[in-house]
Swiss-Prot record:
This is Lipoprotein LpqB. A lipid is attached at residue 20 (N-palmitoyl cysteine). It is found in: Cell membrane. The gene is lpqB. The lineage of its organism: Bacteria, Bacillati, Actinomycetota, Actinomycetes, Mycobacteriales. SMART domains: Germane. Keywords: Cell membrane, Lipoprotein, Membrane, Palmitate, Signal.
């Protein structure tokens, strides 16, 4: 949120300087990238009979298209205003705009009031926000021979929310996680009206790189000095029908420095999943410096050729659903829920647990004297079905979360984030994680911390809010939580528990009886899940790409998919319908 307000105050500050602003010699990178294209036909244009109020509203709609330095919006400006208006940087998305006018026969001075709903960076990164727009300063209109035109306005861009929704489409870029195991989502908003140019736009964005907070958390195999030789075409070189039907897509790259086969496969995975998830179908013919990227795929790649990196894959799915029932770990076996073998099935007083990403190991927190002044919590880690070893202790420990490298992350006493790994001798090593940026921006106890499935992000519950941070490995091999920001302003301070459903989608349980389960994505946009057949309180949530489980007052229930009869509903997991039982999944 602090970055959003920084954008606001920069815009406000810019008003003071706008009187002496010169013609900007360059514009910021277009929010939709570098593709040259005509303005979308739906954008408004000024007409001689427009009233000043109407002209201003149409101007805000026209700012939705940044092509050619917001040429569509500049049609609403006088020549001098167009020369001095600096459209660089992020745009503020506003709604419920009110104009307060002071009129003279030939000039109108306007003060604008609005609600902030978010910001859109020059890379196409959207983040939600909230609050009233600080007064950006006066906007002045003058009567010209062509009708009213804006003669003075603040620097920066204010974007009408409704027009943004109708002009921009959300697409996802994919970069590589540090282990080279999977790809990591980076959602962007793109306003390309010509579908044949979308593939070029997305590949260009891949080459430009990830959003700033991901720069030190992912790898980009398409980074400099790699470039795109020309527009993406059909597989046969045609310029229309790119990625539609069986036409496929052809991507010609140059300056490739990657030589090893695995890195080339990861490069292909970035392109393929980015285009595939945007509805641009294969085969994907990928050439580098005039030759096939991989001689095995001269006729093109399919998504199945990079299935190992599928961002929707769930590696631990075979482990199935587990639960903590009466303090011990059980597994779901048809209509039975027997205790698992080994320590996790025998130990009492387990309050939270998680299965490893591989489904082979487990971690659980045992709590003695819960709620008492001398409460004690211990973390146990070991093979699922085998013998566990104590790894950590504290007064309180959060629900454990596994990373891709089989480290277990927990929060000790609500403040200290710790990463537990096995050292060379097999003993647990406890390594502190730098959570200083989180504590500085969002002070308060961390009630939960869950790593994304790709391990590059951490979602936390702090003060009933969802806080997202990047997981960054430092040069010394340590880890830090950086770039914290709040997600889901509409959730208030009601969040109890959270779980990653996919790399871009978080499920939360809440104290709100009207909306006990909600969703929030990486942009911060939240929506409500069904509430029918849930008994408050709803506590622990566990999720994977296909299913959501929550613990309510009766036991564990799962979200059943939509049927012909209606919307998704919560159904009982019969063997786990014991009060106090909580769901456990890999993650």
């Amino acid at each position: 949120m602090s970055r959003l307000w920084a954008v606001v105050w920069l815009l406000v500050f810019a008003v003071a300087a706008s009187g002496c602003a010169g013609v900007p010699n360059s514009s910021a990178p277009q929010a939709i990238g570098t593709v040259e294209r005509p303005a979308p036909p739906s954008l408004p244009k000024p007409t001689p009979g427009m009233d000043p109020d109407v002209l201003l509203r149409e101007f805000l709609k026209a700012t939705a298209d940044p092509a050619n330095r917001h040429l569509a919006a500049r049609q609403f400006l006088t020549e001098s205003a167009s020369q001095s208006w600096d459209d660089a940087g992020s745009a503020l998305l506003i709604d419920r705009v009110v104009f307060v006018e002071t009129r003279e026969p030939e000039r109108v001075s306007v003060t604008m009031r609005a609600d902030i709903l978010g910001s859109l960076s020059d890379m196409g990164v959207f983040e939600t926000g909230e609050g009233a727009l600080p007064d950006p300063g006066p906007i002045e209109l003058v009567k010209t021979t062509d009708g009213w035109r804006i003669d003075r306005l603040p620097n920066g861009v204010f974007l009408d929310w409704q027009q943004f929704q109708s002009t921009y489409k959300r697409n996802t870029l994919y970069f590589v996680d540090p282990t080279g195991t999977t790809v990591v989502p980076d959602p962007r908003y793109v306003a390309v009206s010509d579908s044949d140019q979308l593939a070029t736009e997305l590949v260009s964005k891949l080459i430009a790189g990830p959003r700033p907070e991901m720069a030190n958390t992912v790898r980009n195999l398409l980074g400099a000095p790699l470039t795109l030789r020309g527009p993406v075409t059909r597989a046969d070189g045609g310029k229309t029908g790119v990625g539609r039907g069986y036409g496929g897509a052809r991507i010609d790259l140059e300056n490739l420095s990657t030589t090893d086969p695995h890195s080339r496969q990861l490069l292909a995975a970035q392109i393929i999943w980015t285009l595939n998830r945007a509805g641009i179908n294969g085969p994907y013919v990928i050439n580098a410096d005039g030759a096939p990227l991989d001689d095995r795929f001269t006729d093109g790649w399919e998504s199945s050729d990079v299935a190992a990196t599928d961002p929707g894959a769930f590696a631990g799915a075979a482990a199935g659903l587990h639960a903590l029932m009466n303090g011990s770990l059980v597994s779901l076996d048809g209509q039975r829920a027997p205790r698992v073998a080994g320590s996790f099935g025998q130990a009492p007083n387990q309050a939270s647990a998680a299965i490893s990403r591989s489904g082979q190991d487990a971690a659980s927190v045992v709590v003695l004297r819960p709620g008492a002044p001398d409460m004690q919590s211990t973390l146990w880690i070991g093979p699922l079905g085998g013998r566990a070893a104590q790894a950590l202790e504290g007064k309180s420990l959060s629900r454990p979360s596994w990373s891709l490298d089989d480290a277990v992350w927990v929060v000790v006493d609500g403040a200290n984030v710790v990463r537990v790994i096995q050292d060379a001798s097999g003993a647990p090593a406890r390594i502190p994680v730098d959570a200083g940026p989180v504590a500085l921006e969002f002070p308060g106890p961390i009630a939960e911390l869950q790593l994304s499935r790709d391990g590059t992000r951490a979602a936390m519950v702090i003060g009933g809010q969802v806080i997202l941070a990047s997981v960054e490995q430092t040069e010394g091999g340590q880890y830090a939580l950086t770039y914290p920001r709040r997600l889901g302003f509409g959730l208030g301070e009601t969040v109890v528990s959270l779980a990653w459903r996919t790399g871009d989608d978080i499920v939360v349980s809440r104290k709100d009886p009207q909306h006990p389960v909600s969703y929030v994505n990486l942009d911060g946009v939240n929506s409500d899940g069904p509430s029918r057949n849930l008994a408050m309180p709803v506590t622990t949530v566990a999720a994977n790409p296909s299913t959501v489980y929550v613990a309510d007052a009766r036991g564990v229930v799962q979200l059943s998919p939509s049927t012909a009869e209606g919307d998704p509903t919560w159904t009982e997991v019969r063997p786990l319908m014991v009060a106090g039982t909580i769901p456990v999944l890999p993650g």
